[in-house]
Amino acid sequence: MKNIIFLIALTPLLLHGQTEELKQRTSLFLQEQSETFKIKELNGSEPDYGILKETQFIFHQYYQLKQIDKEINELGNSVRPKYDLSTFAYEDEEELKYALKFWFKEFIGHKRITPGRDYKTVYHVEPAVIIIEGNTISILTLSCYATDIEEFRDWRSTMLGVFGSPNAMVVEIGCNGPIEWTKNSPDPKDPNWRR
């Protein structure tokens, strides 16, 4: 009986520790970007991530990064690109896996995807870098018209440096597709990922 009471008392501390690590990583990422971007923590107007927000996460943050200086995009317009950063934490890796299975049924762009399988075209999606690590999901959404391939690679590298590890899964989404699993992709034939 004492063990059960001890476990019940310990559970909130463990969950707090997991969310605290994600908060620290997010804070580090935002601090690295603070010289170039104006950063706002927002409650609404988050990009459409499919049904991810319907999953049972224990912690969620959303930030918008708007570039301070204007730049010329590939269409020749002077713009201040904006980027969206969303982070989600789950109770444990099993909860994350359950959430991913649910999310993949209606992924970004309302596309049903199979884990580990790439897709060439997905209409109405913005470029994004998704890092799935431990019990967290971190998503950085970029602009189709303000992002070139070099900038995309820089963002991917920065995201991996802060939110990733050698075991992190990385999903990259281009403007209107493709969706590519570029690091530690799951085996599409693995029965653990079957719906």
Protein language model features and the residues they cover:
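Soluble, non-membrane globular domain cores that form compact, hydrophobic packing
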Residues: L15-D84, A89-R195
